[in-house]
């Protein structure tokens, strides 16, 4: 979203709404956007359980602008230490599910559809996982 305070949000049904950026973290490449629409489905958060190494992880996003893309893999690590561009060490869920530019901010979910994380980084020499077909 850069420094924009208003963004266009495209819903799964194709509707486009103007959204207000209420928070953003450039180091994680994610933002929280408020839209004025009620009755939208909400993805449940897996707050009661921690992801486990080996469990299936499903990544949702729009890599390279390909809306509503789903990829899958497994959880490879649950507390991988990463040093951000700001020098801050944070922990992350590592998965081998293909993540590419455009997946940032999308959900990482378990097979029950519960959100276990947010896609926000890729470790790659090329900058992408490619393999989108």
Where are the predicted features?
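Serine-dependent protease modules
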Residues: 1-133
């Amino acid at each position: 979203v850069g420094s924009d305070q208003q963004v266009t949000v495209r819903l799964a049904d194709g509707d486009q709404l103007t959204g207000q950026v209420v928070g953003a973290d450039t180091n994680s490449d994610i933002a929280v956007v408020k839209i004025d629409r009620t009755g939208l489905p909400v993805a449940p958060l897996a707050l009661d359980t921690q992801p486990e190494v080996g469990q299936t992880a499903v990544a949702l996003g729009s890599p390279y602008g390909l809306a509503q893309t789903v990829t899958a893999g497994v959880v490879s690590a649950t507390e991988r230490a990463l040093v951000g561009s700001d020098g801050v060490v944070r922990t992350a869920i590592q998965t081998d599910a293909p993540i590419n530019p455009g997946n940032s901010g999308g959900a990482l979910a378990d097979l029950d559809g519960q959100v276990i994380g947010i896609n926000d980084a890729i470790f790659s020499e090329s900058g992408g996982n490619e393999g989108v077909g």
